[in-house]
Regions:
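N-terminal membrane topogenic signal
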Residues: 1-15, 107-108
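Extracytoplasmic loop-helix module adjacent to an early transmembrane segment
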Residues: 9-56, 68-72
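Short hydrophobic/aromatic helix or loop-helix immediately within or flanking a transmembrane segment
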Residues: 53-78, 82-86
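Hydrophobic, membrane-inserted alpha-helices
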Residues: 64-68, 93-94, 114-122
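Transmembrane-helix signature of polytopic, membrane-embedded enzymes
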Residues: 99-121
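Aromatic- and kink-enriched transmembrane "portal" helix at the membrane-lumen/periplasm boundary
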Residues: 114-136
C-alpha cells in the first residue's frame, strides 16, 4: 500500500462504522444483552441510592472514573451506554481498516478488503452493536 493511500482504510472504516451505527439507530432495537449492564447504567445515573459510585467492581478505574465525573455533571444522560456505543463504533472502524490493510499487504485490492470489512460488520459487528454488553 502506498503512503498516499494510507488514509483510505481509515476513511472507509469510519464511513462503514458510522453507516452501521446509523442503521442500527434508525432500524434496530438497541438493548442490553445482560442485566449486569443495566445495573451499571442505573448506578452511574444515580438510581437506587441517589449517589453515583466512586468505583465499580466490574469496571476498570480508567472507565469508571470518567463515568463518575460525567454522571455527576449530567446524571440524566446514560453515559455508560454512550461509552459502550462509542467504543463499539471505534472497534468496528479499526476492524475494517485492519482488514483492508491485510488485503492490500497480500496484493489484493483494497476494494476486496472493504467488501470483507462490510461482510464482517454485517455478520459479526452488528450482533455486538445491537446487543450491547460490557463482557463482549
Amino acid at each position: 500500500m502506498k503512503k498516499k493511500a494510507a488514509w483510505i482504510p481509515w476513511l472507509t472504516g469510519l464511513c462503514m462504522s458510522t453507516a452501521l451505527m446509523a442503521a442500527i439507530f434508525l432500524f434496530g432495537d438497541l438493548k442490553y444483552a445482560m442485566n449486569d449492564d443495566t445495573a451499571i447504567l442505573r448506578q452511574y445515573m444515580g438510581f437506587g441510592t441517589g449517589a453515583i459510585p466512586e468505583a465499580h467492581a466490574f469496571l476498570h478505574p480508567l472507565l469508571s472514573t470518567p463515568l463518575r465525573w460525567l454522571g455527576l455533571a449530567a446524571p440524566e444522560v446514560p453515559w455508560f451506554s454512550w461509552m459502550q456505543l462509542a467504543l463499539l463504533w471505534l472497534a468496528c472502524m479499526v476492524s475494517v481498516k485492519a482488514l483492508m490493510q491485510c488485503f492490500a499487504k497480500r496484493g489484493f485490492s483494497m476494494a476486496l478488503g472493504a467488501a470483507a470489512g462490510a461482510g464482517y460488520l454485517t455478520l459479526f459487528g452488528m450482533t455486538y452493536a445491537c446487543h450491547v454488553t460490557f463482557t463482549a
